[in-house]
Structure formats: C-alpha cells, structure tokens
Amino acid sequence: MTELNIPKFFDQVEEKQYLLTEEFPEVMQINVGSLCNITCSHCHVDGGPTRKNNMVRETFEQIIEAFKVGKYKTMDITGGAPEMNPNFRWFLKEISQHAKTIIVRTNLIILDVPAYRDIPELYRDLKVQVVASLPYYNEKVVAKQRGKGVFPKSIEVLRRLNELGYGKEEDLILNLVYNPNGAFLPPKQEALEKTYKKKLYDNFEIVFNNLFAITNNPIGRFSEFLHREDLYEGYMNKLYKAYNPATLPGLMCRNMISVGPDGSLYDCDFNYIEKLKISGEVNHVSQLVDNHTGVRRIVTGMHCYGCTAGAGSSGGETC
C-alpha cells in the first residue's frame, strides 16, 4: 500500500497477462518534444513556448529505420505541438512511405499561426488522421483551460479542416479530444460525442468523426495543480474507486512502443514523463534496428489508474 492507502497498480491487476505487451506491436508513438505555442493547465508533458527538448534529425532517421524493420503499421506523433519541430514536415513525408496509418495530435491553433498554415494541406495530401484537442464546445470553458482567444481560433481551424474534406471524406479522419476541466472523471463518451456533434454543427456547422474522452492523468502540470489545490489524494482515490478491469485488454500500451524526444523507449507517453523506461536491455530506438524487444512486461505506476478508470480513457487511443 502507498501513503495514499491505495494499492500499487501492478498489485491491483489480478490478470497479470494484461500487463504484457504483444510480441509484435503495431503502433509506434513518438513524442517529438514539449515545445508548444500554448500552456494548458492539464498538460501532462508541461508543454509550452520555452521548452527546448526538440527531437533532432538523427533520432527521426533512427525511428524510420526501426519502424521499417519492426514492421509497425501506425505512426502516432505527439508533442508539445508536434508541428513546431523543425523536422516535422520532412518526417511526415518520409514516414508516409512506410506507415499504413499516420496520426498527428494537434492543439489546432498552431495551424492558425502563419508559419504553419500550410500544414493542413500536407495532412490532406498524406491522408494523416488528425486528433485535435478541443476541451469543450463553448468558449468560456476552453478559455479557462487553454487561455483567452483559443476557442475561436480552434473553430476557425476546424472549419478549414472541414473545407479540405476532413470529417467529411472517408479517408480524411478528424477526431476530437475532450479533457475534464478539473479533478473529475469525464462523462460517458457516447453521450458527450452526441452533444459535441450537435453543438458544433448547430453553432458553427463543424463536423467531425469521433470524440475521445480522456481522463486527466495525475502527472505533469495537472499533478502540480492537484497538489497546489490539495486535491491529489481525493483525485487518486476517485480513480482507484473507478478502477475497471474490463479496460485492461484494450489498453494501447499493450500494442505500442513509445519513443521520447531523445530516442529513449517507453511503454507510453505518460511513462516518458514519469521517466519509466521499458523493461529489458533494449532502451533506445537505435537499438530496435538490430534487436527485437519481444513480449515485454509493461512498467506501471499510480498514474495507470487514470487509463483504467470507468469506461477507460480512450484518448484517441492514448491510453
């Protein structure tokens, strides 16, 4: 038991086979750095304009080789605002020659900045699946979490993506992500998606494919908020009480390997923030070219309760 009087996550899981990965994961997720044009209150990577841990060209090249050798199918790109990495456009074009599916997680408003306004067309041309963060469907709530002026810019970018065919054409997928604006669990995803679709279409004529409801994980900037407001213990107990073993088979960490900005390997992006590298001797993407990790035991922590609470945190398949 921890000081919170909550079992360690590993001990909580009775069916330990679900804490093992697939032998040949299909998804490679990469975090290209925490550089971002906004500073969100819930951000688990502490993203912001002053962050300097950008992934370098050499690491991108190692990722491409490892992706090919490992016969991965999906490349999942996150940050920060991944578009701000100077190698981003080049990498998208290169990896599109090898990946069946490319996912980019965007904050939307970076695509309204003049230096990045060409990227939506690149997404369209490469059939990139866009997973866009939109914490709510009205300005007041979004402003509290992401800052004043973010919501109208997000709406403008969504309109532009719709104009390019996103959310409308079969091969141009636009998914949105909801984060709770506080120390509570997200509502049921299906009902929330219906509300999002109605509100965004009725008010702005915006359409999208799916909504993913993410539970805020108690790490990074959100953890700082919880401790500052003396909410950490209560929130962890809330996650623990909502633990649902039925979520375990579908956890993305079971079918994924995650690469940090410096090329280090993790079971998920949350473990990257917690500095919990994968088990075994292979711990850098450059080693994947000549080594196969095989079935791995997933390295767990208390934050894993965030992905297994309630119906599970789909996260656009983040968890």
Where do the language-model regions lie?
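Alpha-helical structural signal in soluble globular domains
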Residues: A66, W90-H98, L122-L126, V157-R160, ...
